[in-house]
Swiss-Prot record:
Location of the region described as Disordered in the Swiss-Prot/TrEMBL record: 23-43
Organism of provenance: Acanthamoeba polyphaga mimivirus (APMV)
PANTHER family: STRUCTURE-SPECIFIC ENDONUCLEASE SUBUNIT SLX1
Residues annotated as domain GIY-YIG: 2-82
Protein name: Uncharacterized protein L300
Species classification: Viruses, Varidnaviria, Bamfordvirae, Nucleocytoviricota, Megaviricetes
Matches recorded under Gene3D superfamilies: GIY-YIG endonuclease (3.40.1440.10)
Superkingdom classification of source: Viruses
Amino acid sequence: MDNWVCYLIMSLDSKETYIGSTNNRQRRLNDHNNLNPSRKGAKRTRGRTWIPILYISGFENKNACLSFESGWKRLSKKRNIQRLLLINEISNIKLNYNNDPKWNRIMDLLYFVHNITFIGTKFKLNSDVKHPVILPENLFIEIMNEDWITELSWPYFINTYMISFD
């Protein structure tokens, strides 16, 4: 069994994205793609072909992974350019949201990891610094054929690396 990971997948049919978590990557991807007749995957992903964009690992346990997933997903509800201003200033580049669902999910992730604190087994958004700043030891982002993601301004506790399917 794999350790718990949070993942981003994208539909080849519609370019929609989906964030989830699992402790068995291949089984879960097969579920999303309906390759396992006894399992159907998440209702929202049925009937499409999905490919992995990235996996995030390094969580202490299942609860930590699930809280990370929840925090990352929640950011898509109220996107605004203001949240990327500090990251733009730090990295000296201009990041913005656009009409690409994959790009927007990556921007949400970038914002989330720059503004989290880790309390107990939960990741909390801490952009207004209401909580003590406690960062995780190390999180790893395994990126599938999207090398531009490694070039973004990730915090020091994030390690990115590419996995190529060539």
